Each structure stands twice: as structure tokens, then as C-alpha cells.
Amino acid sequence: MASTLPTTWPHESVKFEDVSLTFTKEEWAQLDLQQKCLYREIMMENYNNMISVEHHFSKPNVISQLEEAEDCWPMEREIRQDILPECSGPSLDPGMNSFPAESPLMKIKVVEVLTLNKDVAGPRNALIQSLYPESRENLNPGNLKPAKPSKRLTDTEALRQKFRHFQYEESAGPQKAVSRLRKLCHQWLQPNIRSKKQIIELLVFEQFLSALPEKFRVWLESQHPEDCRAAVALLENMTSVTKDDAQLVCSSEATDQLKEKRKDVATLPVTVPPEEPVTFQDVAVGFSQEEWRLLGPVQRTEYHDVMLETLGNLVSVGWEPTLENRAISPDSPIPVVKPIHDPNPKDLSRNGIQSTVFEIISQDRVQEIHTIESNQAGLLQEKSHPQKKLSESSKSQEGTNLHKSQGSLDEVPPRKHVKVKQKGTRKGKDRKNTISMTRGLRIRNQQKDSVEWQGRGDSNPMTHGYSIKNQRGSEQGTAGARRDPITLTVSAQFYQKATGSEEGRFRDNSNAIVPDTPTKIHQKSPEWHKVGRSNNSMSSVQNDQMGSGAGRGRDNTILTHALPVKIHQKGYEEGKVQGNRNSLRHVKAHQKGSKGERVRELSTSEKHVPYIKNHLKTSEREKGRENNDSIKYGPYIKTCYRGSEVRKLRRANNCTKAISRHAQQIFFIKIHKGSQVCRCSECGKMFRNSRYFSVHKKIHTGERPYMCMACGKAFVQSSSLTQHLRIHSGERPFECSECGRTFNDRSAISQHLRTHTGAKPYHCQHCGKAFRQSSHLTRHERTHTGERPYVCSNCGKAFTQSSHLIGHQKTHRIKFKKQPKL
């Protein structure tokens, strides 16, 4: 026997010859049928293991012969073929019948299995050692024990191979062939032992293996899974499957195009002050394209939160970022780490990248996030409006640019621009607000009571759109006040710049995240004061803009989540703001039918944000300042004008808790000690929102302030009255796109759509049964708890449903009518 076993593991890649066994004709003739079958299994397993570790080479001739042959060496006919049914070795040269007196096998004490799988090699070696007695030095046919069928001989895979590889030539006629095939099928499936479900599982498992790619199938067969569940678990846990899937997503052509585009992208310099001990690059973590594809949604979300928290911590200790790194959501495309020139090169990742700029890689383009250098004199101009250049001599200027974020809907048309230009402030300074809006935005001009549409052609889809200019009066009230708001629905990404003193220069908070919250912004005060940046960059963004003119500051704030905004522009009356509606938390942007839009403003009594109130109430005088001089952008953004309030808000927001990215599910998670929580004195329910508590109190007091003028019915909430009025008017604005049915309530069409989709979102915690409506779930849970809330006042009998009680009460009325008259 000529063996090619290496004494030491070579430095180059392993070849099939390094783990294979070869025999000469004389050596082959000395082997019996069982030894030949064992040799075939070992060679096939070694070949499969080499393929499983991604060794690409041509198939050896020995493996081809072993795969093509059906019977195991026909010259050994005296040994029964059913002993080793899975043996299908090659028909070697029939001249190998000689049995020389001396053989190299005589010098081998114990034959070891050469395989890369140690779990398989151990049992095989034990089997070989049991066949060959260790007390004898020579191995000859007389020393071998009688061949006994091992456990593997009766394995399901072996029986399946016999059934699948059955040849018609093995039987004398068709009748015997059918009977033989039926017998093999019974031996494989064993219908007298297995159930129908188990038999079906075997057939599904066989088809699953045949449907797999050859590379995965060969590796899976080498692991010998028992059923489909084990096979699926092996495939899911295999790391190479994930890598192959990641490579399949990016084709070779797309990779070449990506490399060319990445070369064209200009690198951006990072200006880091030499005295700064820590930079963002020191604590940032970068991922390559292949590494990002391997991350799951949960891992991407964690990376997103960690990077935002890291940036917030750096900003809180006084670090001034020079790059506007846009936050990457988990559903965003793959970010690629781009090398840039850094005066202080440091290794940030295992790929040796010195400093990074995040890129958003889409299907056909590479779009790099532009940066804004804070040490330059002017704002970075947008390429879409070259004719609207910002004047360097302007002392006071504010630019607001709202862009569509990654988390918004995909079906939104291209964006539009609406410019609101304000003039005539206290010192004659110009104010500009550039708002990026969606297509089809309707703007109602309150002075002319008409809808104006002004298009502005531009090749850039981010900047072309509508423009409307409104002239505002001076401080003495030269212009009339606008009573009705301009209702907008915008996406949020703000670039703000304000002027102020050099001592209180506002530092940039480039990654403040604002959830999808309806917001009402009141622009009232002609004076812009300046607020220092809060230490908690994750929970709130405070913008303070002062008009002292002693220096220039800049505020560049990016809000990367969709933010519906309603902007109310109100006039002045001798420099004072009319009304105290500036403390509203939010107002929804109503989009209704062709009859127009109706905006219902919330009152200020019980609809303030209860989460910041505790920090701002220290005295009645400061409370008055807050009501007159502050502008609240929802529960997370606040722009105020007093230095004392700024310092107080800094202390209040000095916690490290971060706002949840899904704020529509968790309304507000930052609860400080001493925060006011509303508790109902009647039923004990607790509310963290005073607005919900005020609605709840009306249930106990019986107050129904909203009354229908047609029928006189009263309601607790205005939305209930609006829904009721549709009954009188016959309006059914909600139409099902599937069947065309119309409804007068949004909740009704939501329940109806579940009949088409089959969705059952309400699950019982006791038995797991699902329901389409929450009322059905509540009714079902009473069968588990035994609750019977509906009690008959006549006999005291209780029921689980109100309809059952109504039907029961009818029986009392019938009995009362049947009583004879006295």
C-alpha cells in the first residue's frame, strides 16, 4: 500500500492527495468486500470534507469511479450484497484477483481512518480495531473476525440508497422487479413501524436534500442529519452560508462599479484641534461592506444607538464636531467606511482605516454625506440654489432645511421647497426659513384666501419645488396678524444658523434624534436669544439664538426622523406676543377631503408636556417667562430665550438617558424623580400624559362638552362628535381598495382590512388564540378569568356579554306581561 500521508502539516493549501489512500493491484486484491466498502466510504468522506472547507479542485478519477459504480466489486459474489447495502464502489480491474503471499497490510497493526471530521473518525477507528485483534502483529485473512453488520448497515440512508439505486437488470422479469422494489421500499419506509407523518417527513427530507445546492448538500450529507429539523439547524448555524449569501447579493459587476465610484468620491479633511485629547475617530467603530451585510437588524440597531450615544458623550464634554455624520437607521442601506486624510492617523478598526466618513450606498449610486466645517465664516451653500447665495455681511441669518429621512415612507413623491422669508424685525435683519416639503403641498394664503402654487424648476430632486414669500411687519405691528396657521407636513432635517455673542457660542449637536411626533412651531418673538447646548444631546435639542451682534455663532442640527410640523406665524402688537399658545406641545396636521382642512388647536390648560414641567417650575415669575418667551418643538425639542431658563434646563437635562428611537410606541421613557404623574382619584388609574387624564376625568364626571346640533347627542371627545356627524351627512371617506366598501370611521376600515389580509393581532395570553378585534379578545379572556361584569338588576344573574344581559332582561318583561290582572 502506497500512502501519501504528510509527516507535518504543509504551509500551502491541503490537497486531496494529502488525505487519500492509494492501492496497487496486488494490494487491492488482498482486500475483501467489507474492506473495500470501508475504503470507499473513507475516500468519499474525505472528498466531501475537502469540499466543505471550500477547497476547489477537479474531481479525482478514484472518486469518479466510486460514484459511477453500482455494485461492489462483482468478483466477491460469495459475500452477500445486502450486508453492505450502501456500498456502491467502482468495478475495478478484474485482473486484481491475485493474492500475493506478502502484503504491506501485514505490517500494519491498526488501520486509522483518514478524515478531517474527528467525530466520524473516532467511531470508525473503533470499528476497525474491533475487527482486527491487537494481540497479533500480522494482518491476514485468517486473523479477521467474521463480518458482522454494523449499526450503519441498517441505517435509513443505506436503505434509501438501495431503493433509489435499484436496477431492472437485477431481476429476471417485471413481476420480480416490482416485488423486489416493493420490498426495498418497505425496508426503507417501514410502514408497519412508522406513522404516515414520519413517512412523509422522510420523503420531504429526501427532496430537501436533493433541492439544495451541491456544495451545501455534500456538506450536509457528511454531517448525517436525522431529519429536516436537524438539517435546517445545521444550515442556519453554518457561518459559510451567511458569507455565501452576502457574496451573492453583491455581484461582481456591482462590486466593480462600486470600486470605481468610491475612487471618484473626494476625501474630506478632518480639522481636529491639536489640544483636543479625544476625537470621534478614537472611539468610533467602522465596518466594511462585507461586515455590514453580515449584521442582523438587531445588531444594526445596537450599532446605531451606540454611535449616537458616543457622539452625544463627546459633544457633552465640549468636543466640536467638524463632520455632520448622519445617523444610520437599521433599515438604511449599507454604510461603507471611507478613508480620509487625518493629521493624526490612528487605527480604528481591524482593517486599519485611519479616519472614517460614512457613505450611504444605494443600488445605483454612492451618496456621501456632506460635511459642514464650523470654523468657516458662512454656511455651506446647497448646490441646488446657486442663485440664492448667502451674504457674508449679513449679521443675522437662519437657514432651516428639512430633508426626507431614511425612516420615512418609500411612496412619498419627490420633495419640494417652500421658502418663508421674514423681514422687518427689530433691527431690520433678514430671516429666511427654507423648508423642504413633499410634492402637492397646499399652502393657504390667509390674506388673499386663495391657494398659491409656485413651481421652481431644478434638476436636483432634493431642492426643486414651490416657493412662497410672506412679508412680515415691524415691531410696532405694521403688518396685520395672521390668525390662521399655515399647515405644513414636512420631513425633518434641520440646518440652523444663528448669530450671538462669542462667549455663549452655540456648539453643534449634529446627531440629535427626534421621533415621529406631530409638532406645532410658533414663531412669535422678534428677538432671538442664544442658548448653550445641553449636555444631554440624545434626549433634547435646545437652540438659543441671541441678537446681540457681538459675535457670530452657528447651529447645525440634523433631525433624521420624519417630523410633521405645523408652523403658526403670528403678528406682533407693540413687541409682545398675542396669546399664550406658544406652549402647545403638538397639533396634528390634518389632511382631509376636498371640502377643505380644519385645524383644531389644543388648549393650554392641561395639554402641556408633563415631562419638562417639573424642571421649569421653580417660581411664578419664571413660569410666566416660560409661557411668554419659550417655543416648544414637541416633548423633546425646546427653544427658549432666557439665560436663567437655559441654565435651569441644562441642569434638568443632565441625565444620560436616551430617547427611544420608536417614540410612537413608547411615548416618553425619561422619567426623573419627582416628575408629576396623574392619578385618578376615582378608579386609581395612572396617566403620564395630562391630556389623556383630562379625557379620562370626563368619564367619571359625566361631562360631555361636544354636542351634536342635529340630534342633541353629546360626546366626551371632539373626534367622537366628528365621527357621529358623518352619520347625519352620510359621508364615508374611508374606502377599501380591495372590495370598494366605504366606512365613516378609520377604526372600522382597519378592522375590515383584516378580513382581507387575515391578520389577527390580538392574542390570548392563556391559550394563544388570536382575534381580529380587541373586543373579541376581551370577551374571550372572560372565559378564562370567569369575570361576569353584566349583572341583572332584577334577579342578580351575571353575564359575560351585554347582549346576553339584554336578552335575559326581556324574559322579565315577558313574565311581567303574562301576570294576570287582579
Swiss-Prot record:
Gene it is expressed from: Nrif1
InterPro entries: KRAB, KRAB_dom_sf, SCAN_dom, SCAN_sf, Znf_C2H2_sf, Znf_C2H2_type
C2H2-type zinc-finger residues: 678-700, 706-728, 734-756, 762-784, 790-812
Keyword hit for Oxidoreductase: no
N-terminal signal peptide: none
Biased composition (Basic residues): 415-430
Region (Disordered), start-end ranges: 376-481, 499-550
Skewed-composition ranges (Basic and acidic residues): 382-392
GO biological process, one term: extrinsic apoptotic signaling pathway
Role according to the record: Transcription regulator which may participate in NGFR/p75(NTR)-mediated apoptosis. Probably acts as a transcription repressor: specifically binds to the 3'-end of zinc-finger coding genes and recruiting chromatin-modifying proteins such as SETDB1 and TRIM28/KAP1, leading to transcription repression.
UniProt-recorded Gene Ontology molecular function terms: chromatin binding; DNA-binding transcription factor activity, RNA polymerase II-specific; neurotrophin p75 receptor binding; RNA polymerase II cis-regulatory region sequence-specific DNA binding; sequence-specific DNA binding; sequence-specific double-stranded DNA binding; zinc ion binding
Record text on subunit structure and interactions: Interacts with NGFR/p75(NTR).
Every SCAN box domain range: 160-242
Cell cycle as UniProt keyword: no
Cross-link (Glycyl lysine isopeptide (Lys-Gly) (interchain with G-Cter in ubiquitin)): K15
This protein's name: Neurotrophin receptor-interacting factor 1
Family: Belongs to the krueppel C2H2-type zinc-finger protein family.
Gene Ontology CC: cytoplasm; nucleolus; nucleus
Chain segments annotated as coiled-coil in the UniProt record: none
CDD domains reported for this sequence: KRAB_A-box, SCAN
Keywords, ordered alphabetically: Apoptosis, Cytoplasm, DNA-binding, Isopeptide bond, Metal-binding, Nucleus, Repeat, Repressor, Transcription, Transcription regulation, Ubl conjugation, Zinc, Zinc-finger
A Pfam short name: SCAN
Domain KRAB residue range list: 14-85, 278-358
Domain of life from the UniProt record: Eukaryota
